[in-house]
Design a protein with these regions (language model features):
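Charged, low-complexity intrinsically disordered terminal segments
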Residues: 1-197
Length: 197
């Protein structure tokens, strides 16, 4: 109602048991653009396992949130559906936030079978990002239709370049031989390796 473009993109498999079938239409009735990524079809398909599990909130391309949290009452402990949940998330500003915006727009375009001009959402025009930071953030994403293991490659690079420590916190510790080798080699080189799962 305030003229702000609001888009919601959700994965059908993660939501089809909890959301009504006409949920996208309900949101559109409220002025929210809504798209369902890879809608579930009860037929055997090679694309059924191509899911989008990312959680991205982008605000004007300048601020973004990402992490493990979903939009559900149990994630803020308003209800206790599966016990008391703990999760983590990040708020990013500047160019890293813009990277997450592009990731969202790529999946939006894929889901809607269109190509959108991402630069029309670039928040700083020709001036460039005014945010200054002494930190470094490397947002990355993967596509469900390729065979590259981008996430694994990023983690292997991080582990292989570590000088002092690698701390990993994950509820799902599923590592292959190359990851075990990289962690072992880093530990033998004096890098402090800690994993909480």
């Amino acid at each position: 109602s305030q003229g702000i473009l609001v888009r919601v993109l959700y994965d059908d498999i993660g939501s089809f048991l909890t959301l009504p079938k006409d949920y996208a239409k309900q949101l559109e009735g409220e002025g929210i653009q809504c798209s369902v990524f890879n809608p579930f079809r009860p037929i055997l398909s090679s694309l059924q396992n191509n899911r989008d599990h990312r959680k991205i909130i982008s605000i004007d391309g300048k601020v973004a949130f990402t992490g493990g949290f979903n939009l559900a009452d149990e994630y803020i402990n308003a209800i206790e559906k599966h016990g008391y949940w703990k999760d983590a998330g990040l708020m990013l500003r500047g160019e890293a936030a813009w990277s997450l915006t592009v990731m969202f727009l790529q999946m939006w375009s894929l889901s809607n079978h269109m190509q959108e001009d991402f630069l029309k959402y670039f928040p700083w025009g020709n001036a460039g990002c005014p945010e200054n930071s002494d930190g470094f953030v490397l947002p990355y994403s993967d596509k469900p239709l390729d065979r590259e293991n981008i996430g694994e490659h990023v983690y292997l690079q991080i582990i292989n370049r570590a000088k002092n420590y690698v701390y990993i916190n994950t509820p799902y510790l599923i590592i292959d031989d190359s990851m075990v080798s990289a962690l072992s080699l880093a530990a033998k080189s004096g890098v402090d390796i800690r994993i909480i799962t």
